[in-house]
Regions:
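Residues in and immediately flanking transmembrane alpha helices
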Residues: 13, 17-18, 249, 531, ...
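P-loop NTPase motor domains
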Residues: 25, 35, 145-153, 194-540, ...
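N-terminal structured subdomain of primase-like DNA metabolism proteins
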Residues: 27-31, 611, 638, 647-649
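Low-complexity, glycine/alanine/valine/leucine- and proline-rich hydrophobic stretches
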Residues: 651-652, 656-675
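Hydrophobic alpha-helical segments involved in membrane association or supramolecular assembly
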Residues: 69-73, 77, 97, 489-497, ...
């Protein structure tokens, strides 16, 4: 604040009064007025009547001078010092000054015979100590005004402006996931909760390796959804890291007295590396693929999972060959689903189907009527083709083009899909045919392993992929292996695709399902955005974990990535590094808020303080990238809240529940003793198939592998025998 000339004048007057009071003290105590005439003596005697100048009251005089110094310094407006040192500039001078003042009183009362001119030595020393003491006290108190109390650089990283009130209350329901946390706000590290009250709107978790996203988010989803009676589908990229946790909670909640787990809940695993730990399942059957459209989607899933993100950016010819490959594979899938299909009851017992001969192909075609062994007409639980599974299809794809088309064209439903291929074959356009089918055969040949043939074989269909069926609920653990990621990922994608179509039905009658996929880019989740967007009514919670947006874009393509991140309602992030991820979180999730900024200007004559409000990032990108392990930030999806207003529609928008933020920036606060107790209770995973030795396992798998090829040869011979020439 700039001083006016009047204030400067008052300050000079007060400063002069200080030293006048010192001179008056010397006049009364140190000088003998008798040689100076009657006028001086009269003045001396009059002043002597003042209490502070009476004999023996020198201490009062010193106190009065000290008070004058204090009053004068209150109005001082010195130039501020950024590097203010209170000890050197205030404490040391003040203590020294008070010491000299006390010393001056002692010197005055200690007579010394030595004289200098008309004054005794002790009087001269008293006067010198008094002046030095007052000057030092004046300097010390004057320096206090040089202190800049505005706290420059006190909040160097802008923590105060970027901290905000977060949810302190636990909000729970039958489906919620609640994560205890602590957050900083207004000088306190407070306790709160991250309440994901609607997991059916989807959740994605992003963070660099080691940021704690699995421990902080994925594991609480497993723990709490298992406890609340969900059917859980879990993808374990590094088997058995998450598998042991899931199995622990399955056993814990199954055996609990107050368990919410549905009766009959089973635990299943799919593992293409250690087949002992795997159930067998057949996703290629009419139960899951009941029309040609479903076959086309299955084919598209398998092909895109093998290509993972390579579909985008191609021209018209690339799209033509891509579509041709999908149509060809779809024709093969649907053919095998229907070839010599037989009806079965719910217990897997074959029923008797009424059939008539097709005049064109001489094949026996079911009429639709089904009877049991007693001759009663019944409704079958499902139909199953004789070789309706993925191993037989993969083996069939290795046959010559001529043989493949001769077999497929015997099915009138798939024949229309074969037109372009047959034309190319008749015209000897082998390069075109290789472009349409050859790439598909190259990709799918990688899937033809002993393990995949064993697990996907139709004779080993151990469980139904509709894990949310109230009559037959189950947990499903889908395992992968980093060393065989692409191949196993494609096989797992096939299972997941058919599973999703089953659980995303039922008109809300299914039990709640939690699909948890950590390390999403290692698994191709076909049209996952569609599942997230439509699965709320069927109570399907989808949780996706990945490291960075560019990683997701590399495997799902830019369009696929955008579809995923824009349909998810709950967003959680650990530490991130990618520019795209940081900009998305800082700008689109957290946005900007009004912040109070303080500016201080110091020059020779004045110090100015400016306060202003402006919009700035609530959580800047640099703050997200610098988060330690265990810290998370993000935003949860909010459910409908009834609007409450006062008289005349008035509303305090700052206190209204409807306008409270669901954003969070916090440190997770788990009970580590409970987690340690949980980890100590982990048990070995179950083996579903037992082999006497590793060699026996290899013999059994190889025998099954060879048998599939023989089955395909037998099928081809049968069809060619009855084929109309």
């Amino acid at each position: 604040m700039e001083e006016s000339k009047e204030l400067q004048g008052f300050y000079k007057i007060f400063r002069a009064v200080i030293y006048i009071s010192v001179l008056m003290e010397f006049f009364e105590y140190a000088i003998d007025p008798s040689p100076m005439g009657s006028i001086v003596c009269d003045l001396h005697s009059r002043i002597k009547q003042w209490m502070i100048y009476q004999d023996g009251n020198m201490a009062y005089s010193k106190i009065a001078t000290f008070l004058l110094v204090c009053i004068t310094c209150v109005g001082t407006r010195n130039k501020k010092h950024l590097e203010f040192d209170a000890r050197k500039q205030v404490l040391y001078p003040l203590v020294s000054g008070v010491g000299f003042i006390v010393l001056s009183v002692w010197l005055f009362n200690t007579p010394m015979e030595m004289r200098v001119y008309m004054f005794s030595l002790n009087t001269l020393l008293y006067m010198a100590a008094s002046v030095i003491g007052v000057v030092l006290v004046h300097i010390a108190l004057d320096n206090i005004s040089k202190f800049l109390k505005e706290g420059l650089l006190k909040d160097r990283f802008n923590f105060e402006n970027e901290s905000f009130e977060q949810c302190k209350d636990l909000q729970t329901n039958d489906y919620s996931v609640n994560i205890p946390m602590r957050y900083y706000y207004k000088g306190k590290f407070r306790k709160g909760w991250v309440n994901i009250v609607n997991p059916f709107r989807g959740t994605w978790v992003v963070g660099t390796p080691g940021s704690g996203k699995t421990f902080s988010i994925i594991e609480p989803f497993i723990r709490q959804h298992s406890e609340k009676g969900f059917a859980v589908v879990l993808y374990d990229y590094k088997f058995p890291t998450l598998a042991t946790k899931l199995y622990y909670h399955y056993l814990k909640n199954k055996n609990a007295k107050d368990s919410k787990m549905p009766k009959g809940m089973k635990f299943n695993m799919i593992n293409f590396v250690d087949v002992e730990y795997s159930r067998r399942v057949n996703p290629i059957q009419l139960k899951y693929i009941n029309n040609l459209a479903a076959a086309s989607e299955t084919a598209e899933t398998l092909l895109e999972s093998l290509q993972k993100g390579k579909k985008e950016g191609g021209g018209g010819s690339d799209q033509f060959f891509q579509t041709s490959a999908v149509n060809f594979l779809a024709a093969c899938i649907y053919f095998f689903c229907n070839w010599e299909k037989e009806p079965y009851d719910k217990d897997g017992n074959m029923l008797i189907a009424e059939k008539v001969q097709d005049k064109q192909t001489l094949r026996m075609i079911p009429t639709g009527r089904v009877f049991d062994k007693m001759g009663n007409e019944v409704e079958p639980a499902y139909w199953l083709g004789k070789y309706s599974d993925m191993p037989h299809i993969l083996s069939f794809l290795n046959e010559s083009y001529q043989t493949i088309f001769e077999v497929l064209e015997t099915d009138n439903e798939v024949a229309p899909l074969l037109g372009p291929f047959q034309t190319a074959l008749k015209n000897r356009a082998m390069e075109q045919l290789e472009g349409m089918i050859g790439t598909l055969r190259v990709y799918t040949s990688r899937l033809a392993t002993k393990e995949s043939y064993w697990i996907f074989h139709k004779d080993g269909d151990d469980f139904d992929l509709k894990v949310s069926d109230p009559k037959n609920p189950s947990y499903l653990l889908i395992a992968n292996d980093p060393e065989m990621e692409s191949i196993i990922g494609a096989l797992n994608a096939l299972i997941l695709n058919r599973l999703v179509t089953r659980v995303n039905t039922g008109q809300g009658k299914n039990i709640p399902t939690s699909i948890i996929v950590d390390e999403l880019p290692t698994l191709y989740f076909h049209k996952i955005h569609r599942l997230i967007g439509t699965a709320r009514s069927n109570k399907v919670s989808v949780t996706l974990g990945f490291q960075e947006l560019p990683q997701l874009e590399a495997d799902y393509g830019k369009v696929g990535m955008q579809k995923i991140i824009t349909t998810v309602g709950n967003v959680v992030s650990g530490s991130a590094r990618s520019k795209e991820t940081l900009e998305w979180l800082s700008s689109d999730i957290f946005g900007k808020v009004v912040q109070l900024k303080k500016g201080v200007t110091i020059d020779r004559d004045k110090t100015s303080i400016n306060l202003n409000e402006n919009m700035d990032s609530l959580v800047p990108a640099s703050k997200i990238s610098d988060m330690p392990t265990g810290w998370i930030c993000g935003q949860t999806a909010r459910d409908f809240v009834k609007t409450k207003t006062g008289r005349g529609g008035s509303m305090n928008i700052q206190e209204s529940e409807e306008f409270k933020t669901s954003k969070f920036y916090c440190k997770t606060d788990f009970n580590m003793a409970d987690i340690k107790k949980e980890e100590d209770g982990y048990v070995a995973l179950p083996k579903f198939y037992t082999f006497k030795s590793r060699d026996e396992r290899e013999r059994i798998l190889y025998k099954n592998f060879v048998q599939v090829g023989e089955d395909v040869k037998s099928m081809i011979n049968t069809i060619q025998r009855y084929r109309v020439k």
